[in-house]
Amino acid sequence: MYKRQLPKHIIDFLKFTFEVVYSNNIHVIAAVFTFGREDLIPDMFIQIIKNLKIDTEKELSDIIYYFERHIEVDSDEHGPLALEMIQQLCGNDSEKWEEALKYSKKALQLRIGLWDGIMTNKKNKLSFA
């Protein structure tokens, strides 16, 4: 399934994602989803919007609207619900909290690797243009 046509940072990210999903550990899946995605995306999108609005707001009004809407929904609804879900799933079980922490950290590391790889690929393409 994981062939050479995809860069390593993408393969690593996808492989981990599917390992988590197929683990069937609902508290781990919820933690990775919450802390590896939902909890960080609003802040990430805010930074993207700030950079997009500098020169190109008219050209990118639809994507800016998408980001702003995503920030609103994640910040006001999804984020708090996801945190509540983690609390309910892990409860007072310290082992579940440890697993949630371990897998959330790995998810964040792999997401950073994914974005770093994307930036490197983009810079390499620009340097050859």
Give the positions of each predicted feature.
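Non-heme di-metal
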Residues: K3-A129
